[in-house]
Amino acid sequence: MTCRTPSLALVLVLVATATLGAQTPDGAALFEERCAQCHTPPGVDRAPTLEALRGRGPDAIVNALTDGLMQVEGADLTGPERLAVAVFIAGTDRGDTTDTTLGACESAPALGDPLAAPYWTGWGAGPRNLRFQPAEHARLTAGQVPDLTLRWAVGFADTTSMWAQPTVAGGHLFIGGQDGTVSAFDAATGCRHWAYGASAGVRTAISLGARSDDRGHALFFGDVDANVYAIDAATGDELWTREVETHPGARITGAPVLHDGRLYVTVSSLEEALASNPGYPCCTFRGSVVALDAATGDEIWKRYVIPETPGPDGTTADGDQRFGPAGAAIWSAPTVDAGRGVLYVATGNAYTQPAAETSDSIMAIELTTGAIRWWNQLTPGDAFIICRGNNPNCPEDAGPDHDFGASPALVTMSNGRDLLVVGQKSGMTYGLNPESDGGVVWRYRAGPGSALGGIEWGFAVDDEKAYFANSGLITPEPGGLSAVRLRTGELVWYAEPPPPLCAGEGRSGGFGCNAALAAAITAIPGVIFSGSNDGGLRAHSADTGAVIWTFDTNREFETVNGVPASGGSMNASGPVVVDGMVYVSVGYQFIGSRPGNVLLAFGLN
């Protein structure tokens, strides 16, 4: 008997192992069943190909199937099934989490007062969102720009899109990652001081401000699960977190803005993508602005930009319940007008018909109460979701998807008057009068416009001119840079897009190789910096638009932290200029754009 027991045990183990093996989900089969229709040729609009998805790690794909963009498709899959699909798509097994000890600094100098020296915080280098860095903070002249050289590079593991824009202050660079890691790097060398792990990817720029308890400074940011965070700027220690919207499609893409002890947060969504699944009950998300106590994270007020609560609104052609009104996501950071006691937000398209009156609008919302003071809808009737086939969720008369993705800019012109400058994916730009309920002062067309821009993520303004980069990512002639006179909207100059670097000598070009300028641009006195879809970081003369410096990111980089890294398209976030250095995030895996995973820093020898 003593001889038979091990044999029986071995048989049981083998049987159990065989049974488990038989039950292991087939990731390839699940992909073919659930995903191939959209992610293999001919595919659908905006869905990345399987090859493009291969740059993501399995964890990121599991997250997308659980509570991200593909949550509807993954809703009835088991955990092992989601993992099997993710491993198949990624082409690799689940790996370790990001190693934040790589490239660690040997010493940690005190942060001190990070706002006492040159800095860039938040999205637009200030609450007015001008994306103009004055000379005392830039410490870089037009004459010096041609001498910029690469000083350091940092690679981001398991990353295909460098969503976030850096914040630089007190000799530190703060940035969030696609995997939720928020890091503090040394701005001069690129070594890492500390890291903090958010619960989801961080797409926003980070805002920095003094703590109310006089214990240093705090960093504020949001993630793609609609959580807002406050952490200590010197240590990365968590101060508080707050979920500001419970809708499953909600996310935060615009940088929070700190003003007078309050943190103002805008909320966007991916529901227009979720609704591409015919089984999704469309649609119930509404864009909103939330005011939080910066010290505690407690909610002070919340304002949905569509006042009416979504409810049953008829049935689809298939007899399913339809809901509405919905949409008007706010993709960008709010703009503070302290003198008038309001903040300005730019809203996106509606998801349902009839399109809400506040979709595709510029809105003024009172800082103290959240009351809507006025709005100006610049594109009415724009009801849009991502449609495929005979999806009953699709609006009968779909709009052009011409949301506002860029923050409004509040500028005081050289004549002392204020102007609110806005740019839209339609390709139209406007000067609005903040004193007359946002009345239109001038219009200028910067590009033909499309669902991917037009003006996609951001423009720059000084006291005489506004500078607009044209995306045109899915138009025949993408790219181009315009300068217009602030007082009149008249064109001062137009710079033709240069030939794409990714299609240069010895290069094949191919998918995602074009001159689109979807990324936000940045101005300093005499210079405009632009990052292109072709992988080129360029500096232009603010007087003529002529290119005075170019850096080609289409290559692999030796990194401070040893993580393999390569350049690619620049999209969404823009260059940041502080204390004689230029910082840029490179890589953006989306429709018509190419992946990358590197943060680059340039300076003078």
Feature annotation, model-predicted:
Residues Q23-P41:
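Sequence/structural segment immediately N-terminal to covalent heme-attachment motifs in c-type
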Residues A142-A157, V182-V202, L208-G216, F220-A250, ...:
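Extracytoplasmic/lumenal domain signature
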Residues M1-R4:
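N-terminal secretory signal peptides that target proteins for export/translocation
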Residues S7-T19:
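Bacterial N-terminal signal peptides
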Residues Q23, P134-V168, L173-F174, Y196:
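Asp/Glu-centered strand-loop micro-motifs enriched in Gly/Pro and often flanked by an aromatic residue
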Residues R46-A47, P127-P134, D158-A164, S183:
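Short, solvent-exposed loop/turn elements at domain surfaces
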Residues L102-R151, V305, T309-P310:
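Blade/loop signatures of beta-propeller domains
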Residues Q37, A47-D93, V342:
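Extracytoplasmic electron-transfer domains, predominantly the class I c-type cytochrome c fold
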